[in-house]
Amino acid sequence: MLSRLQKEILTDFPAPPQTEVEICHVDPALSEYLAPAFYITAPIDDISHNRIYINDAKNDTDIYYFTTLAHEGYPGHLYQTICTSSYGAPEVLSLLNYPGYTEGWATYTEMQSFYYAGLDPDLASLLQHNQAATLSLYATADIGIHYFGWEKEKNAAFWSEYGVDDTATVKRITDLILEEPGNYLKYYVGYLKFRQMREQLALENKSFSVSAFHEAILRTGPSPFSVLEETVRDQLK
């Protein structure tokens, strides 16, 4: 699947540098406590060795597995890390944390990957929009609970509006949101910022190139969106 992604993304993304990728599987003893998948960021002095861990207990369909590898690998975290490094980004960036950029980019590319899976275009669009809608619900509940102070009843009523009435399911979702306030916003809001930036710059530039847009983002590297948009706009002129 990674090999397919590496080939398919070349229509929309610049070619990545050569690197080694090891796919590892989470030990069953830890599967209950770890994310569905995660990328171990390569050290700055050895960017050529990369690892992606897959939690088999939380992957149940081929398309889920495919888009997860896109999020963590190509053109997601791994790809962004090695490309930004190959473009000569200052090493000090590794000390800074811009989760809206890193997780927003990975989510943005995950959404793109539905169209690289060989699915019927209408089905790919449906699955992509369903994934985006699901993330939007989690992000809205995150804001509701941690900013507006939703009580249990208000939170349950929110999920019920969207057909989620099972008490155990609502509790599981709520527990995830309570564990890390604001966590879902870096994924969903970050994703929206990249989409909005792409749409806006495409309107401004008649010769807009998606691949050049992505390259400008990667060359800039993790940064605040206010800085990123200005820098990308300058690079596309």
Region spans (language model):
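Long, His/Glu/Asp-enriched segments that create or flank divalent metal/ion-associated functional microenvironments
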Residues: M1-K237
